[in-house]
Every structure is written in C-alpha cells, then in structure tokens.
UniProtKB/Swiss-Prot annotation:
Its EC number is 6.1.1.4. This is Leucine--tRNA ligase. Gene3D superfamilies: 3.10.20.590, HUPs (3.40.50.620), Isoleucyl-tRNA Synthetase, Domain 1 (1.10.730.10). Keywords: Aminoacyl-tRNA synthetase, ATP-binding, Cytoplasm, Ligase, Nucleotide-binding, Protein biosynthesis.
Length: 804
C-alpha cells in the first residue's frame, strides 16, 4: 500500500497548527540558531516552484537544529510595499491594500501546505502600520545622525507617466512601459549617506561566511580606488576643473579634459562660437539613462567647448570637451583624458583627431592604447620611473604646486531614497513655511499612509500623496506656523532593510526590539535567498545595521553571519521559467498529485543547492517512488507496523546505519542535501536486502528523513509507537567503531586464475584463510584430481593455490 499523501499531510499540518509545535520561546539561556529566508513579495501569481527550494533548505536546517537541542528562530513575513501592487491598483481601480491582503492569504496557504516549520506568531508585514512605525523611526535616527538629506539629483523624469523612473526602466530614451519620452531633470530627492559607511561595508566583508563571488560583487559595487585629486586651471578665467584619477603618473599624457554635459562649469566656460552645439548636445544627453551613457559598446560622442585648461605639471594648454560617457554623479564629473594609455580616451581621441602623447613605453600608440606596465617617458621628472614610484612622485609634485593631493574615491553613490509613489512608507518629515524642516515627533508615529482611491501620479513630479490636502497640510499647534508634509514615499528596500530584527520581538510596542532578545538572537546564523539580491538588498541592510550598531541598538556589527544563494530551477528544456513560455510549474499542482514531501525531497535531490537545474517530471516521480518504498518497508497493507521491524540487532545493518548517520549529519552541516538523500536511499536499499531491520535503526532513519519530508516523518514516527511529535526528538548519533568494516573480501586464485571471492573476518590467520579457501566449492572443483604444490596466503588480500 502506498501512503495517502493528501490525508497524511493535512493531518500533520493541522496538528502542528493546533499544538503550535514550532513556536519559538525566548529561552535566553539555551543555545540558539536563527535561520532566515528572504521574505517574498506577495505577487498576484502566488508561489512558484523556485520559492520552496530556498525555503526547504532553511526548513531542513531548522528542524535538524531543533533535534540537536537548539532554540531555533525560523520566521516568515511579507515584503508587501512596492510598484506591482500600485500598478495593479492603477490598472483595476482596486485598493492596493485589498490586493496585497488577498495575495498574502494565497502565499500563506501555499507555504503552510508545504509543511515549513515557521513560527507564525512572529509573522511581519512591511505594510502594517505597527511595522512601518519602526521603519519611520529608523529613518528619523538616520536623519538625526546627519545620514538623511535632501539633494538636487538628476533623475529620469517621464512627464507622460508623471513620475521618476529608475535607470532600468528607461530604454533608448523612452519609458519601458508605454514608450514615453524620458528626460534627465534635476529634482529634489531624499538621499541616504551610505558612502559614509563605505570603508566599513568593505572591510567587514572579510569576517563573513558568504560565497566569495557574492562578496566580490559587493566589493565591485563599492568600488574603492586610491589615486589623486588634480586641479586644472581654466585658461583666461578664475575657474578650475577638478578631476579624480587613479593614474596621476600619466598626467604628462593628459591631452584634453572631458566634462559631463551637466557639469556646473560647462555653461560659463563655453565660448560663444560653440554655445549652440553644446546646448544641443546637453539636450540629447538628458534623454539618456546612465546605463546607456556608459555602455562600452556604444559609439563615442562629444563636443568641444572652445575652452582650454592648463596642465599643472607640463604647463601645456589642453582642450576641454563635454561627452555623455562622463557622468556628473561619479567622481568629480570630469576626467583628464590620457588617450595613449586608456582605451576609451583613445577611441575618443581617434574619432575627433585629438593629440595622443605616449608617456609609458612598451606599446605602439599608433595602433592602440597601451595599458600595460613600463618606464615613463616624455614625463619630465617622472622619466625612467616604473608605475608605483611614478604615482608617488606625481602626487608629491602636485602637492608642492598646490594642484592636487592623494585621495580615495568610491564608485558607490549615496542611496536615492525617495519615490514619487503612493504605495510605500510615508517619510516622516514636515517642511515649514519659514524654510525649516523637522521630523514628525516619535510619539506621533506611525505616520499613517492615508487611504484614497486617487493614487494616480500627480503629474508634478510629486507623489499622489500631494493630491490629499488633509494629509499634506499641517499647522504647528504651538506657533500657528503652516507646513507641508513630505509627499515622497520610501523605496521598497526600506522595509526589507531591518525585518530580520523585528522577527526577534514582533509585538513590542515600545521599541524596535528588546535589547536582551537582540543580544540573544543576533547575528542571523543562516540566510538563504536568490543571488539577485547580492548587492542592493544586502548592502542596504548591512548599512542600516551598522548605523543601528553605532547607535547602540543592535549588538553586532553585521546582520547575517552565513549567507547562501540557492540556484535557479529551470524549465524542462533548460530555459528560465516564465509565463510567456508557458513553462511555469505551480507547486499547488505538485502538492495535489505527488505530495509536499515529494516536492521537498525532489527539489533537494535535484543537485547541489546552489546549481541551476532543469525541472524533470521523471525525477519528481522517482522521489515519490522512494517515499513509497520507505513506507512499504515500515508499514503493512493494513496500516500496522511491519513484522520485519524487530527489537533485536543481528548486526547486519550496523555499518551502513552508522555510515548513514555520519554522512547525513556531515552533509546537513554543509547544505549538501542531495548527497545526504543519496545516502538515505543507500540505507533503504540495504534494508530491503535483509530479513530483519533493527527498530532503533529505522527510528534513526525516520529522524533523518523527517527534516526533508516532515509529514511522512511524523506519520512513520507514530506508526513506530510514539505519541509525541518527532520535532524535538534527539538527532541520531553514530559509533565510530562501527563505521569500519570488520570483514574484508579476499580473492582466491588457482594457478593465477580467479576462482572465488570470499568475505572473511579481518583478523583471520593465514592458516584459517587457507582452510576457508580450500573448502570453497568452486576452488574444490578447480583442484579436483590435482596435487597441491603450494598455498600462499596474504592476510586481508588473497589466497593463491598452485596445483598440478
């Protein structure tokens, strides 16, 4: 009889719910383990089969750690603010709250049906005012610390959509949605000073147990580089152009400067002759996103301003150009171009027939830029020096002339924090009519997002909140001064920056979380999620955590000690699953047809957890067949315990059982679930080969299977005669001595030809080996009628019989 998954899974899910089996108690004296999933955005589509892969991995570890006696925190919640809900509301006229609530109900049902051991009493939802009260509170702390400020920033403004778009939402100067024209336009925005923490964010990566590739992505995003800031005087004016360069040693080869079209000096230094061309170029550049402008493959464009600067070391006059590949947001918004030794500058110089001066020997600058090492030439006092020595000397010379200094630069920009959208956390700031600005008093938090059916963009560049007078207009009760609330909202990243802290104390009305509880649970011991969050979410969360650490609110410098990225589950044809390809697999269907345990087992057995692997119906069926074999081994047709399960140990499974406990334990520690499952299969195969199976071994097996397939685990545990849940049963242990086989297989040869393979005890003497060999039927037949001349026995290896 195969097991009835629908019946069994429902039974145990109800049991766990009614008994609050997975409720985490704040027993601060017990050893702890905090296993965290990246909480999902509850979309209208519901869960897909990619979600359970990471969730199953953390669930296995959570269940395993409970059995090892750990106090486990394993929570779940919803990252529910953001554009898709707002877009749905705009398209349908429905309230994003209703849409979000309905989606969460679907997600929660699906997650519960997969048997994950979450403590639902700790559920959080970023759109719940009791949650975002603390998101707003953190913003106020950032503001008070000088880390939140208003700045005029060039943004992608789309008048037709009435909003600012991210770089990713702009393609070839038009909006991805609707194809409307997009312009670069300076607008006042809230910005968070993440750059203040750049060095810490970089240095502390070394202490984290994260994949090296992911750490490298963060290092590259922060992009720390050492070099020099250099000042070029603009000829015949008071102006100066400041540039940052990592190669100040090549300054004698700087034959022109390039400014971004938005650079503050452009309009004042451009000569009358070039004003029209410069203006036209600036207009064109404003239609492009930063991504388009810096695309290495695109053809270089630019315009001469008519102005010249003076090279501070050579004294030569150099032309000043503008070009859109230089961004105002990076460095100083200006570069010194050294075409002989930089590919991009070389391409630009060749296109516009500009001077190319070789200053490092070793290449042929007639054909290409030389970017290798070499001695300096045509470089005054730097001649003959190698790179490092020349860099040091160049900085020294610039400092002596007051024209430069050593400087560290970062690719990392401050975090543009405001969104002109409705469905987000209101920013708790009031702008007063006298030009001052204050945050909302903490005792008035949460500042509620007003309910409205008018959520279309305002058209002015402000968020739809600007249309709600009752929200916007305020009067100071003490002074009578009028003010306007900030109408921009926070980005979707805000709520996910700190949710792992709220899980620790989700119902606390007086503080973000109790300091003692934070001390007990932090840092997160295991965080599993997709690699798509490698930079932004993880960098932003680390930044907020470091600020909270400096404020004495959290006790650790880092939030997530160990991080792991699960791979992607592809469609059967090795393609990414997508609605348009029609190859998306709904977990609901699998739970119905094969069972949640089969889905969990299969996703863990597909291959290494971090690999991208194609879905296979055959593989799914194979996983179900394995669970059926386990069931049939232990349970009779009539549902009673098989008579094969006995209470006496005939030792036949000693070795394979102890090997299995060791292998599964070791593999769980390294998240090697696919090889752990292989070993469980080996054990079951061995059980089918023997007449009797020792009951404690089957109990140990069921304990190891239960974290992967918890419903069948609970059911088999009860069939084995236990009334309590398997959840908190002690994890099996193994005996080192029994891992080693006390038997060996020897070969028996007659006149050099193999005649038999025999298993014998390891400590069998030579004499006994000879006796055993000579009494073997095959050997007897081979030597019948012959005289035995010699018998050679090599302990634990072979017996060779010479007969004539």
């Amino acid at each position: 009889m195969n097991y009835n998954h629908n019946q069994i899974e429902k039974k145990w899910q109800d049991y766990w719910d009614e008994n609050k089996t997975f409720k985490t108690n704040d027993n601060l004296g017990q050893k702890k383990f905090y296993a965290l999933d990246m909480f999902p955005y509850p979309s209208g589509a519901g869960l897909h089969v990619g979600h359970p892969e990471g969730y199953t991995a953390t669930d296995i570890i959570s269940r395993y750690k409970r059995m090892q006696g750990y106090n486990v925190l394993h929570p779940m919640g919803w990252d529910a603010f953001g554009l898709p809900a707002e877009q749905y509301a705009l398209d349908t006229g429905n309230d994003p709250r209703e849409f979000t609530k309905k989606n969460i109900q679907t997600f929660k049902r699906q997650i519960k049906e997969l048997g994950f051991s979450y403590d639902w009493d700790r559920e959080v939802n970023t759109t719940d005012p009791e949650y975002y009260k603390w998101t707003q509170w953190i913003f106020i702390q950032l503001y008070n610390k000088g880390l939140a400020y208003v700045d005029e920033v060039a943004v992608n403004w789309c008048p037709a959509l009435g909003t600012v778009l991210s770089n990713e939402e702009v393609i070839d100067g038009v909006s991805e949605r609707g194809g409307h024209p997009v312009y670069r336009k300076p607008m006042k925005q809230w910005v968070l000073k993440i750059t203040e923490y750049a060095d810490q964010l970089l240095a502390d990566l070394d202490d984290l147990d994260w994949p090296e590739s992911l750490k490298d992505m963060q290092r590259n995003w922060i992009g720390r580089s050492e070099g020099a800031k250099v000042s070029f005087d603009v000829d015949n004016t008071e102006g100066k152009v400041e540039v940052f360069t990592t190669r100040p040693d090549t300054i004698y080869g700087a034959s022109f400067l390039v400014l971004s079209p938005e650079h503050a000096l452009v309009n004042s230094i451009t000569t009358d002759e070039y004003k029209e061309k410069v203006k036209a170029y600036q207009t064109e550049a404003s239609k492009k996103s930063d991504l388009e402008r810096t695309d290495l493959a695109k053809d270089k464009s630019g315009v001469f301003t008519g102005a010249y600067a003076i090279n501070p070391l050579s004294g030569e006059k150099v032309q000043i150009w503008i070009a859109d590949y230089v961004l105002s947001t990076y460095g100083t918004g200006a570069i010194m171009a050294v075409p002989a030794h930089d590919d991009r500058d070389y391409e630009f110089a060749k296109k516009f027939d500009l001077l190319i001066i070789e200053v490092i020997e070793g290449g042929n600058v007639e054909e290409a830029a030389y970017t290798g090492e070499g001695k300096h030439i045509n470089s005054g006092e730097l001649d003959g020096l190698e790179n490092e020595a020349a860099i040091t000397k160049a900085i020294q010379l610039l400092e002596q002339k007051g024209a430069g200094e050593k400087k560290v630069n970062y690719k990392l920009r401050d975090w543009l924090f405001s969104r002109q959208r409705y469905w987000g956390e209101p920013i708790p700031v009031i702008h007063w009519e006298d030009g001052t600005m204050t945050t909302v008093p903490e005792e008035e938090l949460p500042l509620l997002l007003p309910e409205t059916d008018e959520i279309k963009p305002s058209g002015t560049g402000e968020s739809p909140l600007a249309n709600i007078d009752s929200f916007v207009n305020v009067v100071d009760e003490k002074t009578g001064m009028k003010g306007r609330r900030e109408t921009n909202t926070m980005p979707q990243w805000a709520g996910s920056c700190w949710y792992y802290l709220r899980y620790i104390d989700p119902k606390n009305e007086n503080m973000l979380a109790d300091p003692e509880k934070l001390k007990h649970w932090l840092p997160v011991d295991l965080y599993i999620g997709g690699v798509e969050h490698a930079v932004l979410h993880l960098l932003y969360a680390r930044f907020w955590h470091k600020v909270l650490y400096d404020l004495g609110i959290v006790p650790t410098k880092e939030p997530f000690q160990k991080l792991f990225n699960q791979g992607m589950i592809l469609g059967e044809g090795n393609e990414k699953m997508s609605k348009s390809k029609g190859n998306v697999i709904n977990p609901d269907d699998i739970v119905q047809s094969h069972g949640a345990d089969t889905l969990r087992l299969y996703e863990m057995f597909m291959g290494p957890l971090d690999a991208a692997i194609a879905w296979s119906e055959k593989g799914l069926d194979g996983s179900r067949r394995f669970l059926d074999r386990v069931w049939r081994l232990i349970v009779n047709e009539d549902g009673t315990l098989s008579s094969k399960i006995v209470t006496t140990n005939n030792k036949s499974l000693d070795k394979v059982y102890n090997q299995t406990v060791k292998k599964v334990t070791d593999d769980f520690e390294t998240l090697g679930f696919n090889t752990a499952i292989s070993q469980l299969m080996v054990f079951i195969n061995e059980c089918y080969k023997v007449d009797e199976v020792y009951k404690p071994y089957i109990e140990g097996f069921v304990k190891m299977l239960a974290p992967i397939a918890p419903h069948i685990g609970e059911e088999l545990w009860s069939k084995l005669g236990h009334e309590e849940s398997i959840t908190y049963q002690p994890w099996p242990t193994y005996d080192e001595a029994l891992l080693v086989d006390d038997e060996v297989e020897i070969v028996v040869q007659v006149n050099g030809k193999l005649r038999a393979k025999i298993k014998i005890a390891k400590d069998t003497s030579k004499e006994e080996m000879q006796e055993i060999a000579l009494s073997n039927d095959n050997v007897k037949a081979s030597i019948e009628g012959k005289d035995i001349m010699k018998v050679i026995a090599v302990p634990q290896k072979l017996v060779n019989i010479v007969a004539k």
